[in-house]
């Protein structure tokens, strides 16, 4: 194996550079993953433009690859061997707290970079920390003993497995957090990666009517929502969304509103409150809304609306996402729209942000070895 690794390192806002980094030394309880796919999502767009800190970082938190080399203890602990394909959660938990013990690594303080300056999380941790390779925009990533792995089922390609993060979020947020189930009616606001993943989750859970809203520029995504199981779609720039929801539900409104818009302000939340049924609907807020002046609390209480929030995913949701991919029930390969190599990281992130000429971008696969191997 080579002595160095090629990685795209974020060195400033909206700037990465390719660097040759030393291959980390491995203890008996560590391993190296050869990265096949690192998915790119909206979080990458945000962290690329406005890094939370100035240290050099190898971004990439949706990582799939094969075990290149592993110590004996690592193999025993995780039940893996060289050559196994795995999906790696971006959380690197302590494995000792109450959250880690139930597979909720997202809540572990050891992986929360917001409150812990020494946190470990793929795509966020500085490359100056021990292990160096803490992100998927690299030929290899470092796996400590407490990395969280999921074996990828036979028949699921690396590119398809690169969808585990958005799909697991869809399962976690729509089903496990909001509680969508059999015969429920749902409005999903925003047909991006997360919204489309929630279409699939709600369909599989038995929802009786799934409505997806978006803007005129989302036409290709709204069309895909119908292919994935949505019953109706609404272009909010061409029709009154609340009136349309009421028409589609015979005036009743929906049981659940799942707001997965980004940078859309308070409008989707207000629409959600209006579109919910007369009593005891549920609104799940998943976006980055920082404040809400004059929040309509009176209407909220009059309609007995339950508001929930969602962030990240559990171990169980990732396993369910892999089962979903393995089943072949839905054309999930349609979510993965673009491929880029390691030397195209800046372009790839900008493409997802809508700042390039690339069309109909949904989920991007960053492939470090693209064009390098036969």
Task: Show the residue positions of the predicted features.
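Rossmann-fold dehydrogenase core element
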Residues: 282-284, 295-334
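C-terminal hydrophobic helical "lid"/dimerization subdomain
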Residues: 2-7, 224, 239-240, 247, ...
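Receiver (REC) domain switch-region micro-motif
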Residues: 86, 186, 255-257
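Cysteine-cluster motifs in flexible loop/terminal segments that predominantly coordinate metals
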Residues: 41, 89-150
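Short N-terminal strand-loop motif that marks the start
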Residues: 1-69, 135, 139-143, 365-374
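Mid-domain Rossmann-like dinucleotide-binding core that forms the NAD(H)/NADP(H) cofactor-binding site
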Residues: 83, 139, 148, 153-239, ...
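Glycine-rich cofactor phosphate-binding loops and adjacent beta1-alpha1 units
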Residues: 177-182, 204-205, 211, 219-223, ...
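Glycine-rich beta-strand-centered segment in the early N-terminal region that forms part
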Residues: 24-38, 51-101, 105-106, 153-155
């Amino acid at each position: 194996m080579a002595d160095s690794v090629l990685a795209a390192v974020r060195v400033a806002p909206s700037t990465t550079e390719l660097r040759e980094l030393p291959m980390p030394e491995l203890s008996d309880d560590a391993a190296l993953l050869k990265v096949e796919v690192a998915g790119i999502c909206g979080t990458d767009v945000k962290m690329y433009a406005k890094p939370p800190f100035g240290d050099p970082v190898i971004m990439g938190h949706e990582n799939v690859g094969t075990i290149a080399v592993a110590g004996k203890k690592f193999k025993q602990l995780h039940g893996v061997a060289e050559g196994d394909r795995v999906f790696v959660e971006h959380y690197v938990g302590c494995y000792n707290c109450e959250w880690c013990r139930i597979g909720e690594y997202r809540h572990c303080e050891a992986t929360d970079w917001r409150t812990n300056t020494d946190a470990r999380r793929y795509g966020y941790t500085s490359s100056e920390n021990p292990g160096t390779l803490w992100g998927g925009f690299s030929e290899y990533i470092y796996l400590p003993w407490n990395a969280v792995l999921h074996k990828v089922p036979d028949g699921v390609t690396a590119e398809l497995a690169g969808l585990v993060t958005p799909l697991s979020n869809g399962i976690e947020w729509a089903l496990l957090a909001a509680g969508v189930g059999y015969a429920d009616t749902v409005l999903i606001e925003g047909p991006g990666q997360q919204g489309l993943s929630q279409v699939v989750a709600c369909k599989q859970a038995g929802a009786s009517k799934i409505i997806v809203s978006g803007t005129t520029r989302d036409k290709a995504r709204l069309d895909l929502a119908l292919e994935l199981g949505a019953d109706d779609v609404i272009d909010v720039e061409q029709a009154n969304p609340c009136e349309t929801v009421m028409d589609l539900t015979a005036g009743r409104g929906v049981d659940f509103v799942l707001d997965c818009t980004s940078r859309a302000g308070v409008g989707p939340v207000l629409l959600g409150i209006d579109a919910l049924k007369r009593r005891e609907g549920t609104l799940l807020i998943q976006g980055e809304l920082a404040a809400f002046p004059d929040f309509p609390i009176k209407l909220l209480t009059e309609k007995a609306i339950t508001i929930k929030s969602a962030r990240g995913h559990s171990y169980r949701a990732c396993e369910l996402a892999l089962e979903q991919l393995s089943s072949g029930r839905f054309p999930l390969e349609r979510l993965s729209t673009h491929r880029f190599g390691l030397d195209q990281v800046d372009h790839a992130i900008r493409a997802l942000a809508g700042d390039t000429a690339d069309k109909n971008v949904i989920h991007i696969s960053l492939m470090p070895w693209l064009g390098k191997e036969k």
